[in-house]
UniProtKB/Swiss-Prot annotation:
The keyword DNA damage does not apply. The modification N6-(retinylidene)lysine is found at K293. Residues 335-347 have a biased composition (Low complexity). Residues 1-33, 94-107, 171-199, 272-283 are extracellular. The record marks E110 as: Plays an important role in the conformation switch to the active conformation. Residues 326-347 are annotated as: Disordered. Photoreceptor required for image-forming vision at low light intensity. While most salt water fish species use retinal as chromophore, most freshwater fish use 3-dehydroretinal, or a mixture of retinal and 3-dehydroretinal. Light-induced isomerization of 11-cis to all-trans retinal triggers a conformational change that activates signaling via G-proteins. Subsequent receptor phosphorylation mediates displacement of the bound G-protein alpha subunit by arrestin and terminates signaling. Signal peptide: none annotated. Disulfide bonds join C107-C184. The lineage of its organism: Eukaryota, Metazoa, Chordata, Craniata, Vertebrata. This is Rhodopsin.
Length: 347
């Protein structure tokens, strides 16, 4: 059922369909599902906000972490905070009422920040891949990655993300409630007059999903080949090679985490867009959508768990300047220092 600013995945034969901005949508799914949704959003908030804020705080507190190669990882944390503050809080509040209580303006705000965070994350991973490729594979001779290059990379992520999230606010496509009608996203569902949804969805999938994905896979493919060749030739010490492989595993795991979170959402959205008129329930879009939001806790967890230097700094911060595990981490510190010397470590 299509309304002026919404689309309900249900045929209104019984006359029960109501605007998701004004009435509870309990006729779509069991009311208990909204409680589960609210609890899940609360979990993402209480985990996502502290861990991303801690990522920023620890990096800013410890000078040795404030390197150009870490700028893009700070950008990832900022993007996740945008999703937590601007997206998850409104979704949790709406789920408590069973409909999107914040109205049309609130839908635009929630949809904008949630999509902005996702796009910044995707483009940050693309820029991160380019940076690693340039540093490790050295496709440009005599090139030294510096602060200006890092700032340019961060700026690129914001420009590209805004190029995807601003158009729906000014008439090229739009943000509407989706799934269980408690969160908003791009209108993949309708061909409403005056919004040119078809062209925007094609533009979004081509330039803001497939293109950065190509960059990520190309750069990491070349990086893996370079690391393998270096290990085979034993051009560097075993410790350095081990540290470089550790960094490679970290960034690859970050990409896998992103794909696990966002690929189902993108696939379902594309299916809905290319199968106009097909019947699908609210959970068909809601489950991938809310599963995708868990990406806000993937990146910092992966970064903290797989980067020994960052983990040491985090422990020092949490224990007020002391590291109770200093003896256990001594060997790890040596490996990370070797990684830093090779200009591959993200710390």
């Amino acid at each position: 059922t299509e309304g002026p600013d919404f689309y309900i995945p249900m045929v209104n034969t019984t006359g029960v369909v109501r605007s998701p901005y004004e009435y509870p949508q309990y006729y779509l799914v069991n009311p208990a599902a909204y409680a589960v949704l609210g609890a899940y959003m609360f979990f993402l908030i209480i985990v996502g906000f502290p861990i991303n804020f801690l990522t920023l705080y620890v990096t800013l507190e410890h000078k040795k972490l404030r390197t150009p190669l870490n700028y893009i990882l700070l950008n990832l944390a900022v993007a996740d905070l945008f999703m937590v503050i601007g997206g998850f809080t409104t979704t949790m509040y709406s789920s408590m009422h069973g409909y999107f209580v914040l109205g049309r303006l609130g839908c635009n705000i929630e949809g904008f920040f949630a999509t902005l965070g996702g796009m910044i994350s995707l483009w940050s991973l693309a820029v991160l891949a380019i940076e690693r490729w340039v540093v490790v594979c050295k496709p440009i001779s005599n090139f030294r990655f510096g602060e200006n290059h890092a700032i340019m990379g961060v700026s690129l992520t914001w420009v590209m993300a805004l190029a995807c999230t601003v158009p729906p606010l000014v008439g090229w496509s739009r943000y509407i409630p989706e799934g269980m009608q408690c969160a908003c996203g791009i209108d993949y569902y309708t061909r409403a007059e005056g919004y040119n949804n078809e062209s925007f969805v094609i533009y979004m999938f081509t330039f803001h999903f497939l293109f950065p994905m190509f960059i990520i896979f190309f750069c990491y493919g070349r990086l893996l080949c370079a690391v393998k060749e270096a290990a085979a030739a034993q051009q560097e010490s075993e410790t350095t090679q081990r540290a470089e492989r550790e960094v490679t595993r970290m960034v690859i795991l970050m990409v896998i985490g992103y794909l696990v979170c966002w690929l189902p959402y993108a696939s379902v959205a594309w299916f809905i867009f290319t199968h106009k008129g097909s019947e699908f329930g609210p959970l068909f879009m809601a489950v991938p959508s809310f599963f995708a939001k868990s990406s806000s806790i993937y990146n910092p967890i992966i970064y903290i768990c797989m980067n020994k230097q960052f983990r040491q700094c985090m422990i020092t911060t949490l224990f007020c300047g002391k590291n109770p595990f200093e003896g256990q981490e001594e060997d790890s510190s040596t490996k990370t220092e070797a990684s830093s010397a090779s200009s591959v470590s993200p710390a």
